[in-house]
């Protein structure tokens, strides 16, 4: 199977690090975006101003799973040059992605208030 690198656009910026990790772990761009858009758990990333999101590798009705897919990204707000409206568009800079064998322990979860603010910025 040949690896096809995703292209950068106004919503997502793919770093070379995440492209290498995607190829190593056999993750597609669509799978990474699905983890970002529908995470089971959100935490603060280990790098400054980052968010880490997780989704089980196989989603079913069980509350236990054998491995997890993690994605770390950073929100980047820049003026939108293409539209004439006044406002800012949020771009997600996808930094890294990895598979975690087993179930990872919960660490610093992001409070619901902050997640609502992030959702308001995105929409």
Task: Describe each PLM feature range.
Residues 1-123:
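Ribonuclease/tRNase effector modules and their secretory precursors
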């Amino acid at each position: 199977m040949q690896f096809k690198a995703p292209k950068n656009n106004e919503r997502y910026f793919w770093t070379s690090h995440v492209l290498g990790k995607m190829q190593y772990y056999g993750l597609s761009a669509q799978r990474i975006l699905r983890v970002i858009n529908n995470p089971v758990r959100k935490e603060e990333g280990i790098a400054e101003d980052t968010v880490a999101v997780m989704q089980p590798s196989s989603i079913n009705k069980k509350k236990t799973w054998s491995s997890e897919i993690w994605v770390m990204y950073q929100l980047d707000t820049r003026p939108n040059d293409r539209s004439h409206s006044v406002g800012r568009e949020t771009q997600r800079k996808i930094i890294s992605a990895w598979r975690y064998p087993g179930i990872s322990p919960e660490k610093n979860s992001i409070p619901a208030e902050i997640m609502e603010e992030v959702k308001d910025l995105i929409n």
